[in-house]
């Protein structure tokens, strides 16, 4: 897979382009007298060191760009890599099936679980079909239907959050967008089974929180979680989206800051360069964290689960 490099990764992109050129020349003419392999190896080591140096000092705006990376693994990628026997379930039994939310029953190391998450889509047609990962009310009602099903069958619930926000269209508002989100917040706080939520990309506002009330809340290293996008915040405060980098720093949208504020429990490390560089390794780390969280929650009573979850929800907004 050819990698897409972000603006701040251009020095890395230039090195990788040189490596690709040398590799192509080597393949075309195997009778070359010079030792290209040594040069390629040297450049690869230099690329790794440069990547390590750049990623050791990322700002909040750069992390926000990584969270939106077009090659970043989505919910269905993690379902494929970390779970077995996934059986997708569709529809809210009231209006429609919202493709921006996917969910179904799967097995995690043999244990039945309910997996629910946002799905953005990659190609243009799929992005449109998935509405760029922005759910309408029927998406959140589908998610709630699946969560209530999980409760009936005593299955843990695992959610993956990756959305710029709930869809703000007129139709969505007419069908009760705010009510659907509010109902999910209330009902998730009352469910009798363990809930583990993980932000895998963008955690945008109420659209993220509507499947984000859990007993454990994790974030991938280069994901974000905020009440508004940096561009939206900049447009309101400075009347210019160009101030988005400044807004990103001020908002505290990155995982270390949110863990410091006790809004999340764990930060799951990503491979060097981000999750898209090695989805298999990222999925293995995510799976290990989910299994660890389930083991911690299995020893708690139902009342303890609900009390802790409710207190977490009520603590949001307090310093």
UniProtKB/Swiss-Prot annotation:
This is Acetyl-coenzyme A carboxylase carboxyl transferase subunit alpha. Residues 35-296 form the CoA carboxyltransferase C-terminal domain. GO terms for molecular function: acetyl-CoA carboxylase activity; ATP binding; carboxyl- or carbamoyltransferase activity. Keywords: ATP-binding, Cytoplasm, Fatty acid biosynthesis, Fatty acid metabolism, Lipid biosynthesis, Lipid metabolism, Nucleotide-binding, Transferase. It is found in: Cytoplasm. InterPro entries: Acetyl_CoA_COase_a_su, ClpP/crotonase-like_dom_sf, COA_CT_C. It catalyses: N(6)-carboxybiotinyl-L-lysyl-[protein] + acetyl-CoA = N(6)-biotinyl-L-lysyl-[protein] + malonyl-CoA. Coiled coil: none annotated. The gene is accA. Its EC number is 2.1.3.15. It holds the Pfam family ACCA. Its main location: cytoplasm. HAMAP family: AcetylCoA_CT_alpha. Belongs to the AccA family. PROSITE patterns: COA_CT_CTER. One of its GO terms (cellular component) is acetyl-CoA carboxylase complex. Pathway: Lipid metabolism; malonyl-CoA biosynthesis; malonyl-CoA from acetyl-CoA: step 1/1. Component of the acetyl coenzyme A carboxylase (ACC) complex. First, biotin carboxylase catalyzes the carboxylation of biotin on its carrier protein (BCCP) and then the CO(2) group is transferred by the carboxyltransferase to acetyl-CoA to form malonyl-CoA. GO terms for biological process: fatty acid biosynthetic process; malonyl-CoA biosynthetic process. Acetyl-CoA carboxylase is a heterohexamer composed of biotin carboxyl carrier protein (AccB), biotin carboxylase (AccC) and two subunits each of ACCase subunit alpha (AccA) and ACCase subunit beta (AccD).
